[in-house]
């Protein structure tokens, strides 16, 4: 596939202000991981500059090797039993009104990391009773009893990303699959928790396939959708097929809202947790 030139609208300014430096210090001093840095998120400068970050639990090594993701793959270290408390303390220090947590996949663990997830949410609530929480979870191999452990910890929003359209999913996701992800979304929604999902575009999908994902998500009870441009992390990752124009992103947002989503964040640099603090108003 030929190299596709990155357009001007994807150029970003990563400026570091005092709040950015403070956020970095808190994250580093608590030996925490963020998807902002491991995933090379283009919004890191903006978010850290506002004092927000998406914490990544379960370590920094993932057991899966999806072709779009920059997170390190390999054999993870044992879970840090102090991590849930360290995350909760960092949220307290950062005075966050809304916290976003995600994780690597831990297919090496008997419970795939579900109990660690539940403990982290509980610790956040214990130390930050006024802070709302959004968690971006893996599929837990579709095991409903493990998904339920996270649901029972009662975060305000649970997100699970479809990542891409049905046709491209097996090409870029190493273990997850489209049907299992829909099952996760359905279980979240059926338990009365606001369900959220996200996809990348620019992988070679067609607009009608994006609409199919929207319809599939709405049928499971999903309320919030994020759509952003796929950016190839390194030459070893899946190539960008196309850079979607800002106008097409706006069109996707309009279509999604008309179909019934409560909110659709759709722009080239949108990522799963972008403007997450604004999504809490769509809870319930």
From Swiss-Prot:
GO molecular function, one term: lipoate synthase activity
Gene that this sequence comes from: lipA
Domain of life: Bacteria
Cofactor: binding comment: Binds 2 [4Fe-4S] clusters per subunit. One cluster is coordinated with 3 cysteines and an exchangeable S-adenosyl-L-methionine.
Coiled coil: none
Span of domain Radical SAM core: 48-262
Keyword line: 4Fe-4S, Cytoplasm, Iron, Iron-sulfur, Metal-binding, S-adenosyl-L-methionine, Transferase
Name the record gives this protein: Lipoyl synthase
Gene3D superfamilies: Aldolase class I
Family: Belongs to the radical SAM superfamily. Lipoyl synthase family.
Ligand binding ([4Fe-4S] cluster 2): 62, 66, 69
Cited Pfam families: Radical_SAM (PF04055)
EC number: 2.8.1.8
Cysteines engaged in disulfide bonds, as pairs: none
UniProt cofactor(s): [4Fe-4S] cluster
Binding site for [4Fe-4S] cluster 1: 36, 41, 47, 273
Subcellular location, record wording: Cytoplasm
One cellular-component annotation, GO: cytoplasm
Pathway recorded for this protein: Protein modification; protein lipoylation via endogenous pathway; protein N(6)-(lipoyl)lysine from octanoyl-[acyl-carrier-protein]: step 2/2
Catalytic activity field: [[Fe-S] cluster scaffold protein carrying a second [4Fe-4S](2+) cluster] + N(6)-octanoyl-L-lysyl-[protein] + 2 oxidized [2Fe-2S]-[ferredoxin] + 2 S-adenosyl-L-methionine + 4 H(+) = [[Fe-S] cluster scaffold protein] + N(6)-[(R)-dihydrolipoyl]-L-lysyl-[protein] + 4 Fe(3+) + 2 hydrogen sulfide + 2 5'-deoxyadenosine + 2 L-methionine + 2 reduced [2Fe-2S]-[ferredoxin]
InterPro entries: Aldolase_TIM, Elp3/MiaA/NifB-like_rSAM, Lipoyl_synth, rSAM
Record has Oxidoreductase as a keyword: no
Family matches, as SUPFAM superfamilies: Radical SAM enzymes
């Amino acid at each position: 596939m030929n190299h596709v030139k990155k357009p001007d609208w994807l150029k970003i300014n990563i400026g570091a202000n005092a709040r950015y430096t403070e956020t970095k210090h808190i994250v580093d001093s608590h030996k925490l991981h963020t998807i902002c840095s491991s995933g090379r998120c283009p919004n890191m400068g903006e978010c850290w500059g506002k004092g927000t970050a998406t914490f990544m639990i379960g370590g920094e090594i993932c057991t899966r090797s999806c072709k779009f993701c920059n997170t390190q793959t390999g054999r993870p270290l044992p879970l840090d039993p102090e991590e849930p408390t360290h995350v909760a303390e960092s949220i307290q220090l950062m005075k966050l009104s809304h916290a976003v947590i995600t994780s690597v996949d831990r297919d090496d663990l008997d419970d795939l990391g579900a109990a660690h997830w539940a403990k982290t949410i509980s610790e956040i609530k214990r130390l930050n009773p006024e802070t709302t929480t959004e968690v971006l979870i893996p599929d837990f191999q579709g095991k409903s009893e493990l998904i339920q452990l996270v649901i029972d910890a009662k975060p305000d929003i649970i997100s699970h990303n479809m990542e891409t359209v049905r046709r491209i999913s097996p090409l870029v996701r190493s273990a997850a699959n489209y049907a299992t992800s829909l099952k996760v979304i359905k279980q979240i929604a059926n338990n009365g928790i606001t369900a959220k999902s996200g996809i990348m575009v620019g992988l070679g999908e067609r607009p009608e396939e994006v609409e199919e994902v929207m319809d599939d998500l709405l049928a499971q009870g999903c309320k919030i959708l994020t759509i952003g441009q796929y950016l190839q992390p390194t030459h070893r990752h899946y190539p960008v097929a196309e850079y979607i124009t800002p106008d097409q992103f706006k069109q996707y947002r309009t279509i999604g809202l008309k179909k019934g989503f409560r909110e659709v964040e759709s722009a080239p640099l949108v990522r799963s947790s972008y403007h997450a603090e604004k999504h809490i108003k769509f809870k319930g």
